[in-house]
């Protein structure tokens, strides 16, 4: 058992530098050891929840059931919980590496890389040899970068199971566009990715063309206009709206926007609608002033993109000035029970804006991609805001078919979840955080009888997978191993050989002159 004596923070004030660094190292080892034990518990829970083959082809299977419990316990998303479960299984596949991890001698980062690089190794003998080699050498590798660690691990995989080397996809297959987390202060987000060179060149020219399509009084720099032009393209615009504000601007003539099927919902407090645009959002960097002007002690409340980041009040004012449509939310007191299973558009809008994300513990799926669930199943429970909440499809299926989960809803939208193990988790509507002045409490509902348990004759049917999770995993591993094996085959011997016309070998490789065999 790994044990360590941690210094009291008060004692560290009188410690010398060497003692402080030693305390840092000891605490880091303790964190690693604690993390390893957390993964051991996750691995055991995963094993218990995935042992039922009768539900293996369910769309929400035993793995999802375990992931839901892990996500609730750690307050993380379903996807992150699933990733922790995959990582935890490495402790079972590589016991010697796991022992070092539990002792705090291998970092979580290194174990994560080992888990990924050895994922295709399935032969027990190769795994045993690889486990012993990695356990022997990993502690001596020192602080290597991720690429160097991957190469070091791959060298041992290549020795014991060459077909298990993870293949690196060529750049063309790695095409993607990624959007980073929003900057809450600036209301911006980073964008990066990889395109075909032809598409990139076309996009570059198109952005420059749009950036130069405004009048000279536009306060934005060319770089800022190019960035805004990308947003205009996403909205289906054929031109960039000029920001000069002049009524007689020649660039403002005509319709600059075309109808699109893309709508972005921004939820804002009424007080935020009166904010003034910030002229410093655009234009060159201002010169440094001797004394910065005083800023108000209280800023206008910000708005929130549905499923996205915060929109500062000045940026919201720019959007409104640019023609964004406004729709005022009805007061929840105006909402009543409805006679049908599906809520009306107004009631659904209220529930989605109130919740903002899936209401399962740790889930952050935006409500626009969620189902609206009756907490007390219809018709025992009414179609009323005090009985409705948003759940993503995965957690909706989990609640409906995995009957170990129970939930109770309060009139203010609070949900109290009880897990199969008896632990309780309380979630609140996100609007309580981002729109604190919005009163969302609705009428309390009378007590209702407990809903009937779902049995074999229940009319609802769980969607089924085409392949079980285990079969899909085996299929993917087989395909990737086959690809690696094909890639590692030696070139065919014999037959016609010739130097390709115009071929130039890489640097450091000698060119061989081959004669054509005459038959």
Curated annotation (Swiss-Prot):
One of its GO terms (cellular component) is plasma membrane. Residues 477-486 have a biased composition (Basic residues). Residues 477-519 are annotated as: Disordered. CDD domains: HNHc (cd00085). This is Uncharacterized protein Rv3776. It comes from Mycobacterium tuberculosis (strain ATCC 25618 / H37Rv). The lineage of its organism: Bacteria, Bacillati, Actinomycetota, Actinomycetes, Mycobacteriales.
């Amino acid at each position: 058992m790994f044990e360590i004596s941690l210094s009291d923070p008060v004692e560290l004030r009188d410690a010398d530098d060497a003692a402080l660094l030693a305390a840092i190292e000891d605490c880091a080892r303790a964190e690693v050891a604690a993390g390893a034990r957390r993964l051991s518990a996750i691995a055991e829970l995963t094993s218990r929840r995935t042992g039922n083959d009768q539900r293996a082809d369910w769309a929400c299977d035993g793995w999802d059931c375990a992931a839901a419990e892990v996500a609730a316990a750690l307050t993380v998303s379903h996807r992150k919980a699933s990733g922790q479960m995959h990582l935890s299984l490495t402790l079972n596949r590589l016991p010697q590496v796991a022992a070092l991890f539990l002792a705090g001698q291998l970092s979580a980062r290194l174990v994560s890389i080992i888990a990924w690089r050895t994922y295709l190794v399935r032969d027990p003998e190769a795994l045993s040899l690889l486990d012993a080699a990695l356990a022997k050498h990993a502690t001596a590798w020192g602080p290597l970068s991720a690429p160097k660690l991957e190469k070091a691990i791959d060298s041992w995989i290549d020795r014991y199971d060459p077909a298990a080397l993870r293949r690196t996809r060529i750049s063309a297959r790695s095409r993607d566009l990624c959007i980073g987390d929003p900057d809450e202060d600036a209301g911006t987000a980073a964008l990066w990715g990889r395109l075909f060179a032809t598409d990139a060149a076309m996009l570059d020219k198109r952005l420059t063309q749009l950036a130069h399509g405004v009048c000279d009084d536009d306060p934005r720099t060319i770089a800022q206009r190019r960035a805004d032009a990308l947003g205009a393209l996403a909205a289906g615009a054929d031109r960039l709206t000029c920001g000069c504000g002049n009524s007689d601007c020649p660039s403002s003539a005509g319709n600059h926007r075309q109808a699109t099927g893309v709508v972005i919902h921004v939820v804002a407090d009424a007080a935020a609608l009166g904010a003034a645009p910030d002229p410093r959002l655009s234009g060159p960097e201002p010169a440094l002033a001797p004394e910065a002007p005083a800023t108000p002690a209280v800023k206008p409340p910000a708005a929130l993109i549905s499923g996205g980041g915060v929109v500062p009040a000045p940026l919201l004012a720019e959007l409104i000035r640019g023609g964004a449509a406004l729709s005022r939310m009805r007061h929840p007191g105006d909402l009543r029970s409805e006679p049908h299973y599906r809520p009306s558009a107004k009631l659904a809008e209220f529930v989605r804006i109130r919740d903002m994300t899936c209401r399962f513990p740790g889930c952050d799926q935006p409500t626009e991609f969620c189902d609206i669930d009756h907490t007390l199943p219809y018709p025992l429970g009414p179609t009323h805001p005090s009985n409705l909440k948003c759940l993503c499809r995965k957690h909706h299926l989990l609640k409906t078919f995995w009957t170990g989960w129970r939930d109770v809803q309060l009139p203010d939208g609070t949900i109290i979840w009880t897990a199969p193990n008896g632990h309780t988790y309380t979630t609140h509507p996100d609007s309580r955080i981002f729109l604190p002045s919005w009163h969302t409490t609705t009428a309390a509902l009378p007590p209702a009888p407990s809903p009937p348990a779902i049995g074999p004759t229940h009319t609802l049917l769980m969607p089924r997978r085409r392949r079980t999770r285990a079969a899909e995993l085996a299929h993917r591993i087989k395909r990737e191993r086959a690809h690696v094996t094909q890639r590692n085959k030696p070139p065919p011997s014999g037959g016609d050989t010739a130097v390709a016309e115009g071929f130039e070998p890489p640097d450091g490789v000698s060119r061989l002159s081959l004669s054509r065999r005459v038959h």
